[in-house]
Amino acid sequence: MNRATATINVTALKHNLSQIKALAPKSLAWAMIKSNGYGHGLVRVAKALSDANAFGVACIDEALTLREVGIKSPIIVMKGFYNEAELSQFARHRLGAVIHCSDQVSLLEKTNLTSSLSVWLKIDTGMNRLGFSVEQSPAVYNQLKTSSSIQKPIGLMTHLADADNENKTFTELQIKRFFSVTEKMIGPKSIVNSAGFFAYPNALVDWIRPGIILYGISPFGINYNSFKEKIEKKFRPVMTLSAKIIAIKNRRQNDSVGYGCTWSCSEDMPIAIVSIGYGDGYPRHAPSGTPVLLNGKICPLIGRVSMDMIAIDLRSQPNAQVGDDVILWGEGLPVEIIAEKAGTIAYELLCKITQRVQFIEIEK
């Protein structure tokens, strides 16, 4: 009873992918499932998203895990390979590689592979993280074209740095740069992430790379209203994080609650202790007033988040009982709201769920 639970609705996951495909019928979906499926479980998510045209992961270990459990779909590794041993694994397990630096090109040229490799040339149009500059990219593309180790055509991709910003100036510049540099290149193209998927229909090219939206979460947080109604109407949250009330206490006016005595009762009042804390991945920096959902009603967090427990104000829930479920985020309480309160992003909260949280799959 004491363990927090992350309930993963695989039906919602499948539904979200179907919505993405319906909104971009001319594009293929490259489902991003890196970082343990955004905290939802790598293998679980891959099996649920069998209708995706390909999967995107961050590193070779994630890709090999999928192959080991029998996932046969195309897998593209976003950071590519870094030595000959890894490169051989790419060929052996039919993994696609993102090529983003000259060291990788050199490795391809000097390594004898058992089979040719599917690759994507990453063009840095302004993210300034990985990829070849706009000026370098044509020469690298021509160099890759001559390699017998590479399948043709070569994929062409970029990554948008600011697609979730209502000011579109920089993203439009990135898209313009990409179309310009790839104009004479032959190969499938990929530009958009989840935010770009909604905000830049002109960039819905051959492949789209949905990530956070697959899990029913807005890439815009709670402050960007242009797509709020569409996202809430068409997409469903996949993860619901919950924990149980393990104690109810009646506290007196001026009693402090929790470490540091940072919060005090304004009157005599009931409080509940809930079996979740930062040791489970709930954000320690969530302030008093952060909402939780109890029996369909909002209750505020009070005091500091502890490693194993939080306290909540029960004044709106006088009939609450030990054993009642408290929803920390998910169905009925968007994780974007909790992220905003905690001064972070939903991605971080999802990826920080720890191993002691029990995961349950449902189809609903």
From Swiss-Prot:
Cofactors (names): pyridoxal 5'-phosphate
Pfam families linked to this entry: Ala_racemase_C, Ala_racemase_N
InterPro entries with a match to the protein in the record: Ala_racemase (IPR000821), Ala_racemase/Decarboxylase_C (IPR009006), Ala_racemase_C (IPR011079), Ala_racemase_N (IPR001608), PLP-binding_barrel (IPR029066)
UniProt binding sites for substrate: 129, 307
UniProt keywords, alphabetically: Isomerase, Pyridoxal phosphate
Entry EC no(s): 5.1.1.1
Record keyword Aminoacyl-tRNA synthetase present: no
Matching PANTHER family: ALANINE RACEMASE (PTHR30511), ALANINE RACEMASE, BIOSYNTHETIC (PTHR30511:SF4)
Name the UniProt record assigns to this protein: Alanine racemase
